[in-house]
């Protein structure tokens, strides 16, 4: 018995990609942006098909992503930012609302929204996840976006 499997590839289908980037903690976020752009280009996306849109911080990212999704001109959206835990509950509010909002936008508009917003306990963890020991989560999010565009195009063609 042969099971039929449908899965996305890492070869970017035609289309434009939006990176919605929170400016807060920019010393980490800019590495995520570089990683995402590099991954997209290496997998076949032209630089002219990548648009970077900057939001003030992670809390504002979901609204910007929603406005971008409403325009229907991007194959996928990659959300990038960094929320670093401090001594107050602020971290939980910002991180939780960001995740919830991005998920809602993806489901509402049927557009892949890749999550590349770091939610970490320390600056050291943020640095590790933006290009050192733990890889670059911006690049990983970009690859997820490519894979989802590929997968959804296959599902829509069936």
Swiss-Prot record:
Keyword terms: Riboflavin biosynthesis, Transferase
The organism's place on the tree of life at top rank: Bacteria
SUPFAM superfamilies membership: Lumazine synthase
GO terms assigned for molecular function: 6,7-dimethyl-8-ribityllumazine synthase activity
Annotated InterPro entries: LS, LS/RS, LS/RS_sf
Reaction catalysed by this enzyme: (2S)-2-hydroxy-3-oxobutyl phosphate + 5-amino-6-(D-ribitylamino)uracil = 6,7-dimethyl-8-(1-D-ribityl)lumazine + phosphate + 2 H2O + H(+)
Assembly and interaction partners: Forms an icosahedral capsid composed of 60 subunits, arranged as a dodecamer of pentamers.
Protein name: 6,7-dimethyl-8-ribityllumazine synthase 1
């Amino acid at each position: 018995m042969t099971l039929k499997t449908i899965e996305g590839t890492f070869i970017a289908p035609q289309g434009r990609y939006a990176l919605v980037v929170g400016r807060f903690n920019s010393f980490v976020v800019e590495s995520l942006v570089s990683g995402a752009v590099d991954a997209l280009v290496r997998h076949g996306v032209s630089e002219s098909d990548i648009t970077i849109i900057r939001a003030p911080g992670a809390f504002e990212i979901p609204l910007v992503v929603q406005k971008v999704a409403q325009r229907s001109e991007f194959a996928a959206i990659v959300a990038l930012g960094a929320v670093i835990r401090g001594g107050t509950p602020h971290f939980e509010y910002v991180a939780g609302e960001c995740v919830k909002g991005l998920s809602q936008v993806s489901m509402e508009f049927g557009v892949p929204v890749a999550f590349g917003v770091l939610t970490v306990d320390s600056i050291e963890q943020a640095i590790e996840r933006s290009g050192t020991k733990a890889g670059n989560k911006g690049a990983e999010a970009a690859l997820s976006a490519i894979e989802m565009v590929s997968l959804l195009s296959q599902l829509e063609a069936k």
